[in-house]
From Swiss-Prot:
The modification Phosphoserine is found at S11, S29. The keyword Transcription regulation does not apply. The modification N6-methylated lysine is found at K5, K10, K19, K24, K28, K37. The modification N6-acetyllysine is found at K10, K15, K19, K24. Acetylation is generally linked to gene activation. Can be acetylated to form H3K9ac, H3K14ac, H3K18ac and H3K23ac. H3K9ac could compete with H3K9me and prevent gene silencing. H3K9ac is restricted to euchromatin. GO terms for molecular function: DNA binding; protein heterodimerization activity; structural constituent of chromatin. InterPro entries: Histone-fold (IPR009072), Histone_H2A/H2B/H3 (IPR007125), Histone_H3/CENP-A (IPR000164). The nucleosome is a histone octamer containing two molecules each of H2A, H2B, H3 and H4 assembled in one H3-H4 heterotetramer and two H2A-H2B heterodimers. The octamer wraps approximately 147 bp of DNA. Belongs to the histone H3 family. This is Histone H3.2. Its main location: nucleus.
Length: 136
């Protein structure tokens, strides 16, 4: 590994760490009471980044099939009663809906980044849809 030049830094003037003799020794020798292990927690954002990578790699549908099918049938009821759907038609609708949502969230994220934020907000979705020409 290449050696890098170290630059001098100003000391912050913090206190030197004190030695803890009695308390640490007592803590180490004492048996663990209860024995309940604290559940492991990742730092905020770690799991979110892992999920982003996982879902960007995958191609499977993210909305469950039956709830989506019920939604399609419920919306179709407003136009005509007793409509029947081929399973491939519902699958095509679901593919299109998920592709639309993914694209909308990508544009929404760009709007949030443009506003120097990392959190998306409803106003970002509204701006993305307005720029796309979907809503005046």
């Amino acid at each position: 590994m290449a050696r890098t030049k170290q630059t001098a830094r100003k000391s912050t003037g913090g206190k030197a760490p004190r030695k803890q003799l009695a308390t640490k020794a007592a803590r180490k020798s004492a048996p663990a009471t209860g024995g309940v292990k604290k559940p492991h927690r990742f730092r905020p954002g770690t799991v979110a980044l892992r999920e982003i990578r996982r879902y960007q790699k995958s191609t499977e549908l993210l909305i469950r099939k039956l709830p989506f099918q019920r939604l399609v049938r419920e919306i179709a009821q407003d136009f005509k009663t007793d409509l029947r759907f081929q399973s491939s038609a519902v699958a095509a609708l679901q593919e299109a809906a998920e592709a639309y949502l993914v694209g909308l969230f990508e544009d929404t994220n760009l709007c949030a980044i443009h506003a120097k934020r990392v959190t998306i907000m409803p106003k970002d979705i509204q701006l993305a849809r307005r720029i796309r020409g979907e809503r005046a």
